[in-house]
Amino acid sequence: MRSFFAIVLMFTLVFPSLFFGADQFGVSQVALAGYSPRAGQSEREWEAKFRAIPDPANLREYMRRLSARPHHVGSAYDKDNAEWILAHFKDWGLDAHIERFDVLFPTPKVRLLEMLAPTKFTAKLEEPALAVDPTSNQKAEQLPTYNAYSIDGDVNGPLVFVNYGLPEDYEKLDRLGISVKGAIVIAKYLHSWRGVKPKVAAEHGAIGCLIYSEPQDDGYTHDNVFPVGPMRPADGVQRGSVMDFASVSPGDPLTPGVGATPDAKRLALKDAKSITKIPVLPISYGDAQPLLAALAGPMAPEEWRGSLPIPYHVGPGPAQVHLKVAFNWDIKPVYDVIAKIPGSVAPGEWVIRGNHHDGWVNGAEDPISAQVSLLEEARALGSLVKQGWKPRRTIIYCAWDGEEPMLLGSTEWVETHADELREHAAVYINTDGNGRGVLTMGGSHSLEQFINGVARDIEDPETKMTVWQRAQLSKIAEAKSAKDPTELRKELRERADLRIDALGSGTDFTAFLDHVGVATLDLGFGGEDDGGIYHSIYDDFYWYTHFSDTTFVYGRALAQTVGTSVMRLADAEVLPFDFVNLADTTDMYRKKLEKLLADKQEEIRERNRELDEGMFKATLDPRRPTVEPAREEVPPHLNFAPMQNAVESLTRSAKHYQQALSQTRASLGDDAVAAKLGALNRELIESERRLTNADGLPRRPWYKHLLYAPGVYSGYEVKTVPGVREGIEQKRYAEAEQEIVRVSKALEDESALIESAARTLEGAGR
């Protein structure tokens, strides 16, 4: 019996959630990382009070107000919303103000798309108002359908269908003998950030780019179209930015790297590097169908074909297209609303929470569905302050402006306050839209254990289990489509924490994580709110209250999840970072890089063998001719040993720190220990910065994080260990070798910092 109880004790320490529940989501008895027993119990009680406050009725009314009119950058209602948010922050007791930045925000003055041959056709480029949708008729205030930061252009040329417009699609076109030089390409939305499509098209010699919403992706293939169902109607169009942010930087194109304040030195428009090289225009599938139907040439590969009732040909031509776009290149104000609750013990350590308030049109789902949760969190925290709660650290709530054009408000704020943030910012927590379904968690892996712990304390409104358990079971259900479902299901059932997603870009955490190196989380619910109204006039209160989180219970769950996270981070005696999962994840990235290289080596060896054997000639269909692929050199061996050694060192330090924290927990509240916690927490705040490099990534110095970055040719999608991974993908093998050395050095520095933190803890406990 003694050994049995020893085993039980061990598992309660390692996997506490398996043995102690959350007392029906009241005050849990599970120990909190970074808290002494007494402080942990007090924190649990305050958190329970907090989670009882958010009210779905308030969320609904906030959304009705904030999405009542179009509120894009430069609009009257955008400023009105900022002032409304400011007034509410102040009413709730927060110290709040607006910070204004002046940014380049183009709006269209000319949009023309017409087919000149073989038949005449002029695209509507309009989204019609719907009688049942009260705000869809606000035409005078709506932004037209366009892609921001497209260059002005007036071009004529043959049309070529390029699937999703990614580099691998152009490789297939090469095999078909199709060139896009001098052509206008038409690409489908999705499978990458939209700005990648004109970037790759221009690199291949195209003179213009159209992007359309394919019904197979977000239209009638999935469900009824709006207003009968949630999907994109035939005339629905996805607006959006095509700024080349991943290659250059997000934020104002005229003030890269510095805040867009009135006295900032601005580039001339012609010198702005993130504007597209060719004109771009988004269109509906209603406008795309006649253009695609007029194409001839080879049939598109089967996987390229969509669900429009036409044969999908590649071209070029005989469709000849005229595209003309011109813009008002104006400087417009953005209004960031910043609110603060001062810390009582460590006011110089900041926990920052943000969501944007601007939309492309009415923007109920994106972004107001999560902005309302942020507001209800702020109201609830203000209520706790009035009841006597005093956060240990300073809490900063941010309602960003200008996110949609490309993270303007948050980037300019971070660039303006970069030195302060490097000194004071502990964690940034982001949301950007919320729906109904399963909690998704992304972020810095030093926070993986922390956010898993929070998720175990929140009730899912539909199933009444924890949002953590629902996320776990959903991942188990989805594992059947994985390459190794058995191994994945085993990990999901046995690993103490669910793996959180690495972060690329696409929302307001980007400058915090990728530029300054602030540990970050990005959270939201979704999966049961499929829809096709993204960035259209139909993303409004009517759509959201009919097809998404109609009772706003998931808006409340988001407020409970994020607000609990904010409180737990703000109140912890020791910031609840854990580095064991970071080390484990980094080692996983190393193994994936080695496999990526090995797979690429074998792929090229096999292709060269097939060329030698004459396989391509033997299998050529003369009625469907293709071009043989070019012979390539097999990639060289890369030495991953420095990275492996660095990860092993990081693992040892992480375990040492974890052990030291466990041994010191009971004495964290002692005066002698408390006096030394400031130095320890400063080391922990520094830990994410150690994973950055002041010189940045190759050819994009604004991006400084060596573990996470948006992909140059994927955009929002993350590239982990980006310098090495993209070096391999882009066949820059010498550069990849150099990046292995840089990453290894950063990991060694991280290991040394964590080892120092462990010794600080051990010294404090003596």
Model region roles, listed by residue range:
Residues 666-766:
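C-terminal amphipathic alpha-helical interaction region
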Residues 137-172, 248-365, 379, 383-387:
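Soluble metallo-hydrolase cores and metallopeptidase-like ectodomains found primarily
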Residues 233-299, 346, 402-545, 571-572, ...:
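Metal-dependent peptidase/peptidase-like ectodomains
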Residues 215, 337, 353-407, 412, ...:
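Alpha-helical metal-binding/catalytic segments enriched in His/Glu/Asp
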Residues 159-231, 344-350, 360, 375-376, ...:
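A conserved hydrophobic secondary-structure block that centers on an alpha-helix together
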Residues 45-53, 67-76, 145-150, 184-191, ...:
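Second-shell loop/turn segments in exported
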Residues 396, 457, 514, 524, ...:
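His/Asp/Glu-rich mid-to-C-terminal helical/loop segments that flank catalytic regions of hydrolases
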Residues 32-45, 64-179, 184, 215, ...:
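Noncatalytic luminal/extracellular "stalk/propeptide" segments of secretory-pathway proteins
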